[in-house]
Amino acid sequence: MKKTVKILLILITVFLKVHCNGGHDDEAADFLSHTNIDDPNNSSDPNKNSDQGDTMGEDEDRLVIDLFREYNFLIRPVKNVSSPPVVVDFGVAMILLINVDEKNQILQTNVWLTMKWNDFQLAWNPAEYGNISNLHVPSDRVWLPDIVLFNNADGNYEVSFKSNVFVDHHGDVTWVPPAMFKSSCRIDVEWFPFDEQCCTLVFGSWTYNSEEVRLHWYNNIQAVQLHDYSYSGIWDVIDVPGQLVHKPDLKENKMVFNVVIRRKTLFYTVILIIPTVLMAFLSVMAFYLPVDSGEKVSLTISLLLALVVFLLLVSKILPPTSNIPLMGKYLLLAFVLNITAVVGTVVIVNIYFRSALSHKMPTWVRKVFLEFLPHLLVMKRPERIPIFNGYFVEEYCASEIFDASLVMPSMTATMLPFLQVTTNLKAASSTSSGQSSEHHENCSKWKKRLSIRMSKRRAPRARLDDDSEDIIDDTNGNHVDSLQEKISKEMKTTVEAIAYIAEHMKREMSLKKMRDDWKYVAMVLDRLILLIFFGVTLGGTLGIICSAPHVFDFVDQEAIISKLNAKYLPSDMYS
């Protein structure tokens, strides 16, 4: 019985000792488990058996236990309510510009945030702890300023990776967490694709006002740090200034960083600008295409459809803002010019196929398009030389049209007298009735030339018989009636048929001449519109594209980064 009581007393004593000592060391033991600092009492590493290792481990273990024995990471590190605000030195270093989503107006960046503040509870005397001057502890064990990105675009306001904090013996805490932010950025598409954007990163405390937590520049660097920046293949960084905004009346304190970037235009120049410019000038060449090819309207409509595709492409890239992008303006100009080209082509085709039977050419059209504009456009029209039975004649004369030498060079000598009789009869009839029988001023000249040509081509004709000579001699005077009676019915029919054929050919040549006039009007109009469209297209191309402020600027990204580092970084950091 006595032995049982002694055993119970011993167990109660052990239980009380364990309970009292265990509660005291719970917090330190839990912290050690997170900081990877081994408990010297439970160490299984044989290397820790050395004197130096034991001393270091014991000092660090003791330091951690002493620092966090009564430390509360939920309380702002101030001694009392009336103490000054906690000053947080804040800085941003941009590592990579990942993407600029123009459609959704989002800037995606990879940055390193730098925050430094003083926590008086984490100060110690290094001499008391084996000259240990700093510690690396988990960030969830110390108080952290709740600084977030205000203009966040994806709902993730905090950093994704909570790195360790660096604590020195003065109580200064430095935290450098990496973060990948998606921030809202107002995209100005007015000069696309030669655009320059200014995106902002706004940081501040989410719950503390300026009387509780106040932001200052880290190392007095009033800009985004670029010393570890990796160049982007799409955008060039132009400037990265920062601004500290402090509004005492609103107790507001925040930092605004402006990231000025400029687009690299080579990709869009090759993919978008050059094809659009070529299509615009190709629509001009539609007016150089002959109407007879039948492809003028098809070419202009095909180009119109291609421009519609490019317009849809630009609309899918850019956001639907109130500003019209530069490329949109040029595509709109090319679109309007192409529609005008379709209308002009239809009008030209309509004019080209007009004839004297359907349209009568007005006098002003003849003067403007056949006389004035050809000289102005340096267009020389070929001489109108109709072809009649293989011989070149400038114009037809009423008297010579029935001459057998002009109509049928191979006609036999027997029929020639009768044709000459008919010609002389018409001439005599015109003279007797008081009508003018004067020929065109060139008729005699052409008649003489044709007589020479005809004499070289045909053999000497047989002499006319006596009856024929008598008929020819008797055509003058009062023997007209008697001579007509001697002509046989067959000869009359032949002469009338030849006269009808000649008259029909004369009429066809006259109609052809009028059709050629309409065709020439269409050619002049084609040339006029071609020059106008070429001038408008060239002027519009140069005027719209060259109006961009940075179209001819060359950006040396390495030189700009070096210049910005020299401008914003302290001399000791830059060197």
UniProtKB/Swiss-Prot annotation:
Tissues where the protein occurs: Specifically expressed in cholinergic ventral cord motoneurons of the VA, VB, DA and DB classes but not AS and VC classes. Expressed in PVQ and DVC neurons in the tail.
Compartments it resides in: Postsynaptic cell membrane; Cell membrane
Knockout consequences: Locomotion is slower. Moderately resistant to paralysis induced by acetylcholine esterase inhibitor aldicarb but sensitivity to acetylcholine agonist levamisole is normal. Reduced both cholinergic and GABAergic motoneuron activities characterized by a reduction in miniature postsynaptic currents in muscles.
A GO molecular-function annotation: excitatory extracellular ligand-gated monoatomic ion channel activity
TM region(s), chain numbering: 271-291, 299-319, 331-351, 528-548
Annotated S-S bridges: 185-199
Parts of the chain on the Cytoplasmic side: 352-527
PROSITE patterns per the UniProt record, alphabetical: NEUROTR_ION_CHANNEL
GO cellular component: acetylcholine-gated channel complex; neuron projection; plasma membrane; postsynaptic membrane; synapse
Its membrane topology: Multi-pass membrane protein
Extracellular side stretches: 21-270
Signal peptide range in chain numbering: 1-20
Alphabetic keyword roster: Cell membrane, Disulfide bond, Glycoprotein, Ion channel, Ion transport, Ligand-gated ion channel, Membrane, Postsynaptic cell membrane, Receptor, Signal, Synapse, Transmembrane, Transmembrane helix, Transport
Assembly, per entry: Component of nicotinic acetylcholine receptor. In cholinergic motoneurons, composed of 2 non-alpha subunits acr-2 and acr-3, and 3 alpha subunits unc-38, unc-63 and acr-12.
Functional summary from the UniProt entry: Non-alpha subunit of nicotinic acetylcholine receptor (nAChR). Acts in cholinergic motoneurons to regulate presynaptic neurotransmitter release, thereby ensuring normal level of excitation of cholinergic motoneurons during locomotion.
Family listed: Belongs to the ligand-gated ion channel (TC 1.A.9) family. Acetylcholine receptor (TC 1.A.9.1) subfamily.
Annotated protein name in UniProt: Acetylcholine receptor subunit beta-type acr-2
Taxonomic classification: Eukaryota, Metazoa, Ecdysozoa, Nematoda, Chromadorea
Gene behind the chain: acr-2
